[in-house]
From Swiss-Prot:
This is UDP-N-acetylglucosamine transporter TMEM241 homolog. The chain crosses the membrane at residues 7-29, 41-61, 67-87, 93-113, 126-146, 147-167, 187-207, 217-237, 248-266, 272-291. The gene is tmem241. One of its GO terms (biological process) is UDP-N-acetylglucosamine transmembrane transport. Golgi-localized UDP-N-acetylglucosamine (UDP-GlcNAc) transporter that transports UDP-N-acetylglucosamine into Golgi lumen.
Length: 296
């Protein structure tokens, strides 16, 4: 694997770890399980910071083309599906289990790419897809903390992630940059999640949240919004400064560090079969990075 750009890569890993730990703390420890509000808040904070950075000239955003914005709206809908379903899944599943299921999104994107773009894949990538599918498929059979709702939302999440990757790849010819797309995602998410907060019952239920006036909740929510934006920005910088293979390598490292440390800080019941499933998922992603690098 290539790990050039250590400063950018390590910064990305730090924000990745901090963001997931903060989200897990708010969702699972404090049990603030109202995704329209939590994700709406995160996208609002991210959108405001991104807008301010744009206005003061720190970042460049160009969303003047209405046709490009309209063409990107399906991506916005998939983005909302990713963060909403991901929030509900992460609140119920341990981080290593969530990552293993999340990685299975490669199976979805691989299927669509074969169907739509007729892409030929090297045998090593096919093997990695097999490992990712096998590990994700065996997880519910060997998870002593099996949660049906958590797995259901994880499946929705991974499907949206896979479709988002394919859709993003199909829009490469457009004039929207990664930051442009993310800015539109933020605006769309704030509006849609805000409108959905009352019909889903989250707005009323949140008024009875036991930690509503506690500083731990306030600081956790503020940190989650800021860290989410910083993680997004670090990811964009990583993609722009390094190759796609190097970006995938750092993403893999960030997941390994986050999943490993989560075993210390968050509750998880590890058994031998579950551990083998998690290791198979990690091996599958490592082989996928290797396949992207070598092309064989």
């Amino acid at each position: 694997m290539y790990f050039r750009g250590p400063a950018v890569g390590l910064t990305f890993c730090c924000f990745y770890l901090s963001s997931y730990f903060t989200n897990k703390y708010v969702l699972s420890v404090l049990k603030f399980t109202y995704p329209t509000l939590f994700q709406g808040w995160q996208t609002l904070v991210g959108g405001l910071i991104l807008h301010i950075c744009w206005k003061v000239g720190w970042l460049e955003i160009n969303c003047n083309s209405r046709s490009d914005v309209v063409l990107w709206l399906p991506g916005c809908a998939l983005f909302v599906g990713i963060i909403y379903a991901g929030s509900r899944a992460l609140s119920r599943l341990p981080i290593p289990v969530f990552f293993t299921l999340h990685n299975a999104a490669e199976v979805v994107s691989y299927g669509f790419q074969r169907l739509l773009f007729r892409e030929k894949c090297p045998y090593s990538k096919i093997f990695s897809i097999f490992l990712l599918l096998l590990s994700a498929g065996c997880l519910p059979l060997h998870d002593p903390q099996f949660d049906a709702d958590g797995y259901f939302w994880a499946v929705i999440h991974l499907f949206c992630v896979g479709c988002y990757k394919v859709f993003k790849k199909s829009q490469k010819s457009g004039s929207l940059s990664d930051l442009d797309q993310q800015y539109i995602n933020y605006v769309f998410s704030v509006v849609l999640l805000g409108l959905a907060s009352h019909p889903t019952g989250d707005l009323i239920s949140a008024l009875e949240f036991p930690f509503l006036y506690f500083y731990r909740f306030h600081s956790g929510c503020c940190a989650s919004g800021i860290l989410g934006f910083l993680l997004m920005l670090a990811s964009v910088k990583l993609r722009s400064n390094l190759s796609s293979v190097q970006h995938a390598s750092w993403n893999f490292v960030a997941k390994v560090i986050t999943a490993g440390l989560s075993l210390i800080y968050f509750q998880i019941t590890l058994t031998v079969p579950l551990t083998l499933c998690l290791l198979a998922g990690g091996l599958g992603e490592a082989v996928l990075v290797y396949a992207e690098r070598t092309g064989v």
